A protein has these predicted regions:
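Metallocofactor- and cofactor-centric catalytic cores in central/energy metabolism, strongly enriched
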Residues: 10-13, 21-137
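Single conserved hydrophobic/aromatic residue that forms the stacking wall/gate
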Residues: 1-5, 9
Length: 137
């Protein structure tokens, strides 16, 4: 629900955080930008949960992708997720993200077995779009 990661893909560093943690926590407005998808749509950069968190949801104010802008300030976790899905997720992945959001309950809905299913599916199938939550629930 809006944590950000800038970590490793397979064995190659994609990006490093450097001093970005200090910058985002001390900046007036923290903005993170990335394309909504990579590898010609095989990978969504907007996922239910990241495997490694560099920036928690408390440090992320705005997310920008090629699909749009999600202003996350003054929103609860579900509202943050909704804003990201509606405004930043690629249409190829929006329904999968909505489906994941419905799996959990409470203030911060999390379906633990399905939380990293996008990543697991990519490792197994080579395409995050093939994610089937029935395998993880």
């Amino acid at each position: 629900y809006s944590s950000a990661a800038s970590d490793v893909y397979k064995r190659q560093m994609m990006n490093g955080i450097g001093g970005s943690g200090d910058f985002t926590r001390n900046g007036y407005l923290s903005i993170f930008s990335c394309p909504s998808i990579t590898k010609e749509g095989l990978i969504s950069n907007i996922v239910p949960h990241v495997a490694h968190v560099d920036h928690t949801e408390h440090s992320v104010d705005v997310i920008i992708t090629d699909q749009g802008i999600a202003d996350l300030r003054h929103k609860d976790p579900v509202q943050r997720a909704e804003a990201i899905i509606e405004n930043c997720a690629n249409p190829m992945y929006q329904q999968l993200l909505w489906d994941y959001l419905k799996l959990g309950a409470g203030q911060t809905p999390v379906a633990l077995k399905a939380a990293l299913s996008f990543h697991a599916t990519f490792q197994e199938e080579g395409d995050m779009r093939k994610t089937d939550f029935a395998k993880y629930c």
